[in-house]
Curated annotation (Swiss-Prot):
Cross-referenced NCBIfam families: fdx_isc
Species this protein is from: Escherichia coli (strain K12)
Entry's Gene Ontology cellular component terms: cytosol
Alphabetized PANTHER family for the sequence: FERREDOXIN-2, MITOCHONDRIAL, FERREDOXIN/ADRENODOXIN
Name of this chain's protein: 2Fe-2S ferredoxin
Stated role: Ferredoxin are iron-sulfur proteins that transfer electrons in a wide variety of metabolic reactions. Although the function of this ferredoxin is unknown it is probable that it has a role as a cellular electron transfer protein. Involved in the in vivo assembly of the Fe-S clusters in a wide variety of iron-sulfur proteins.
Length: 111
């Protein structure tokens, strides 16, 4: 079973976490199943960027992003080359290290 290391996040996971994921499962579903409440305002339909994450290790093992995901990522706060929407990125058999950005578009508008 592949593992996902979630780097520490002040609000969602202050100490970080190591999760077991199922091959084919999205990063978001694995996180939610393990009690890490990543925001997903569009209910996992690839219509927002609130579940934006940065895959620090294992990025190349993920299936390619769709054009729709790429279009949404263009709107993400803090976009990096290793950015993915966690509701779309499906785990393979390789371990991942994932960073959840401090802010999302929703948070940026609230503050």
């Amino acid at each position: 079973m592949p593992k996902i290391v979630i780097l520490p996040h002040q609000d969602l996971c202050p100490d970080g976490a190591v999760l077991e994921a199922n091959s084919g499962e999205t990063i978001l579903d694995a996180a939610l199943r393990n009690g890490i409440e990543i925001e997903h305002a569009c209910e996992k339909s690839c219509a927002c960027t609130t579940c934006h994450c940065i895959v620090r290790e294992g990025f190349d093992s993920l299936p390619e992003s769709s054009e729709q995901e790429d279009d949404m990522l263009d709107k993400a706060w803090g976009l990096e080359p290793e950015s993915r929407l966690s509701c779309q990125a499906r785990v393979t058999d390789e371990d991942l290290v994932v960073e959840i950005p401090r802010y999302t578009i929703n948070h940026a508008r609230e503050h």
